[in-house]
Amino acid sequence: MTLIKFLLTALAGIALGFMITTRVLDRRLSFDTAQAGPWRGQPKSGTMDIDPYANARIARTAELPLGSAEGLSFIARNDSAGAPLRPDCDYIVSGGVPPTRYWTLTLISPKGFLIDNKAKRFGFTSAEVVRAADGTFTIVVARTARSGNWLPVGDARAYALMLRLYDTLLDFGTTKVGADALPKITRGGCA
Amino acid sequence: MTVRFYSFLLYLAGVLFVAGLVHIVAILVMPQVATRDAYARLAALAKPGETTLLPRALPGHQVTPYEDPAFAQAVCLYDLTDGPLHVHADLPDNRLVTISFRTRTGQVFYSMTDRASLHGTIDVRIMTQPQLDAIEAAEGDEDNDQPLKELRLVAPDAKGFVLVDAMSTYPSERAGAEAEVKSVACAPETLAQD
């Protein structure tokens, strides 16, 4: 009887351990987290100093994080108010970006894949974006076509935004980054 | 009642202990046991020791997640067992080109952009520590005054891959970016044995 109890305890522990591992990796948790407003990055994932959780994740998902000299990447799953991004709402991504040679903003599925849309636009590069006279920009993330910089959502039921800064002077190791260093994501109208 | 309660707590502690152990071990061995990691996916598309252009990132046709659709990407898988790998790039355009050197399990041990080029060229030799020692011993002291024209990188493991990225800032530059990453030469060398 005691042996069975011991075995059950071990089995329950193993199952729970695998469950926790899957959950942690799916949620991209790690000790190495940089945050600026809704944007989250893992600046050490492009070095040999990579966090063990990020290391396990890249083995599992096969993603190729940017090398530290290549640039930094950030993912936003929420808007600047903290609410999850909803596919039936419009969002305005606006503001400035730290000194960087190029940046790109891409719309991805929660697992990091591109989402098909009729306009065949999957993101913007800093060169493509139409800017205001003061150099700031506004990108509208919406399901239906908008004038100006429109990033289509397609038929996605959930999505995230990915911001990549290439050849950037921003260094999360030495600088504290405020919420307004990266673009704001403001919710507009909802269908 | 209290005895039963404490014995339940004990079993619960046992479950949590085993779960924690399994979690830590699973995280640590994941890079070694993952079968569908980046290297495995790239190895299905590319031959070792040569530059292979990866298919453009489009919905439903992505080799790896979190690819930037604005980039053309090429890969060179290497195995340094028989000798170093020489990576040579001519970058005449002012296009953003980044090169990352990764281990078999996908960690970046060195990365650079076209800004690190010397008169528009990049020359990198990846080698193991014994190979570097052999090259330095062969060179002796004779040309110590000459600045090195190449970057010598010691790779953590014999196996790994080099990823070359070029940005097409506008869709019209896609063909140019693809041609540029494809033109990066990646040549395995055999060390002269004496």
In which residue ranges do the predicted regions lie?
Chain A
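A compositional/structural signature for long, glycine/proline-rich flexible linkers
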Residues: M1-A191
